[in-house]
Amino acid sequence: MRSNNNNPLTRDEILSRYFPQYRPAVAASQGLSGGSCIIAHDTHRIVLRRHHDPDAPPAHFLRHYRALSQLPASLAPRALFYTPGWMAVEYLHGVVNSALPDADELAALLYHLHQQPRFGWRIALSPLLAQYWSCCDPARRTPFWLRRLKQLQKNGEPRPLRLAPLHMDVHGDNIVLTSAGLRLIDWEYAGDGDIALELAAVWVEDERQHRQLADAYAARARIDARQLWRQIRLWHPWVIMLKAGWFEYRWRQTGEQQFIRLADETWRQLRMKG
């Protein structure tokens, strides 16, 4: 269901107009961004998501809804409703762990996603990195950051190994173990891109876990494991800069200390690796 109302509504207006029998049940949960909530009527729950990024165009939020509308129930929650500034999606009952599933399970989930039809829009990291630079706190801009950004822009993004629909925010809190298996939530950054970029961006604990995931995926996708790992390593500098820039971006938007700590740690990792 999609509304044609062009003016963003408040949460209370959304509830009274479209979900009059529902009431807020949980203010925040795993996989929910700022301003989102769970609403409930008796035992039925729905996730109500708000477009929370003031610097992102409304089209990005609509893409999020369209991605969910295209994906099968074996991968993601169903998209239920859209109006400018808000969407409602199915609430997935299950268990969320901060740790990733084992390599074979996660590889199977990602391979299943990458077998789906493409979304229709490409993920472009270079303009996104430039946006993070321009939108961050000016006091946080450093010559090191600028040098790394210009070097990546000069080199250009790696040539894709295989193009597929990507989730691009795979970590334990965005994976729900339901009675029917693993599902991914929070598709805010989804788009089409290289499968190796997806694998490079997974929030792993260390290189050993990363190699296990890459090897499990290569076996399932029938790709040479060494070739896949080389491609993942080509994307690695882009992913680290993406994470550092995103932490800076969110620090500027929210002022939350967790983001500045994460940004500082990511910059330290980059400097150590030269």
From Swiss-Prot:
It catalyses: thiamine + ATP = thiamine phosphate + ADP + H(+). Pathway: Cofactor biosynthesis; thiamine diphosphate biosynthesis; thiamine phosphate from thiamine: step 1/1. The lineage of its organism: Bacteria, Pseudomonadati, Pseudomonadota, Gammaproteobacteria, Enterobacterales. One of its GO terms (molecular function) is ATP binding. Belongs to the thiamine kinase family. This is Thiamine kinase. It comes from Salmonella dublin (strain CT_02021853). GO terms for biological process: thiamine diphosphate biosynthetic process; thiamine metabolic process. Its EC number is 2.7.1.89. The gene is thiK. Keywords: ATP-binding, Kinase, Nucleotide-binding, Transferase. It comes from the Bacteria. Catalyzes the ATP-dependent phosphorylation of thiamine to thiamine phosphate. Is involved in thiamine salvage. Transmembrane segments: none annotated.
